[in-house]
Amino acid sequence: MTAAENPFVSDTSSLQSQLKEKEKELLAAKAEVEALRTNEELKDRVFKELRENVRKLEEKLGATENQVDQKELERKKLEEEKEDALAAQDAAEEALRRVYTHQQDDDSLPLESIIAPLESQIKIHKHEISALQEDKKALERLTKSKESALLEAERILRSALERALIVEEVQNHNFELRRQIEICQDENKFLEKINRQKVLEIEKLSQSIVELEEAILAGGTAANAVRDYRRQISQLNDEKRTLERELARVKVSASRVALAVANEWKDENDRVMPVKQWLEERRILHGEMQKLKDKLAVSERTAKAESQLKERLKLRLKTIEDGLKGPNTFFVSPTTKTEKSGKILGFLTSGGGSKKRSSSQLRGSVTGRIHAMNQPIDRVGESDEMENSKITANGLTDQHEEDSERKTEEDGNVYSEDMVSGFLYDRLQKEVIALRKLCESKEGTINAKNEEIKMLLKKVDALTKAIEVETKKAKREAAAREKENALAMLNEESKLCRKAKLPRSRIPNPRCQ
């Protein structure tokens, strides 16, 4: 079989050729690696040599600096010697002048014998000064050459340090990239773990939401039953009060009828005075005033409870609005948020069973509970209205306290999980709307209560005015009766005085006067 007939042979040959090419590439890569290693070694050697050269140059620089310092000291010494020589020259000239003056005075000593040694000393000092100046110039040239060599060494050292810094920066950058890769891998693992925990917690929360819905429905039915019983008790109490008032009115009317019947066959002077009737009416009026005062106190307490409830509802509404605004501050991408809300809704709607409900069923239960909370209660009479309003205020405050606690717990759970689903958002929005409606209804009831309080105050004022009128009328009637009695007594005494015909009638009678 030839290579054309057998495809395996061609494949193996192509694979062998590819293997050879890969081996060549591997050898080339190894050669490059070796070249890079040799370059690195050469660079290290060059760095070492440069460091040695720099160290040697620094030593030479130190030595030259020491030499320069020594030369400076020598130069200072020479300058001092020069100054001393100049001072000696001046002293010699002064001595020459003196000698010259003395020679003029006394020609005993020759002038050349004194000047010759001084001139020889001056020449020697001048020669030393010129030699020192030449040494100084040579030292300056040497220092300049040393400084140029030192600058060149500093430039070479700086370039070597820059290369070393570049290499170190590349190595540090590589190490930082490796560390960031490890951190990203750890974060990825941690996020996967948190995602699994969030899914499990969402399932638990959905189950707890269903249980809370059932508990809320059961609590609503129990609260409605208690409210019905309280309303029935208040109705019975109001019926009892109305019957008592009717009985008192019947008694008053019966006493009036009996008084009228008793006074029909009597004279004007012998008629029974309506004091008992007045006292009875006064007692009844005082009783009604006391009842009105009690109703006023009850209405004030109810208004106070309504205001407290209104403040609590406002505070709760504010907290719910802040809670609804709060989740927007979380750092959650929109895609992950939609995925989480879709998972929650899918979990709530896909699973079967009697314990799981849809969002529409939950909205129906919540609206039914809100409707049960906002049911109007029948009122019978003014007192029934007051007491029923008190009962409803107490019931609503208790129920709203429970709702507020439950909502705070739910809000805390939702915020602690760092997510808010569309399901819970709809539910919270429904409850916010219900609370706003409840606040509006409560404001209406408070206004109605205020109007009723004003009407009751007007009635109390009217009753007080009527009582004052009745007291004034009774006082006027009592004064009129006293006047009539006094006039009757005077008439009787005048009649007796006229009928008396005895002589003692002449005696002045004080009654007749």
Swiss-Prot record:
It comes from Arabidopsis thaliana. It is found in: Cytoplasm, Cytoskeleton. InterPro entries: MAP70 (IPR009768). It holds the Pfam family MAP70. The gene is MAP70.5. It comes from the Eukaryota. Residues 60-80 have a biased composition (Basic and acidic residues). GO terms for cellular component: cytoplasm; microtubule. This is Microtubule-associated protein 70-5.
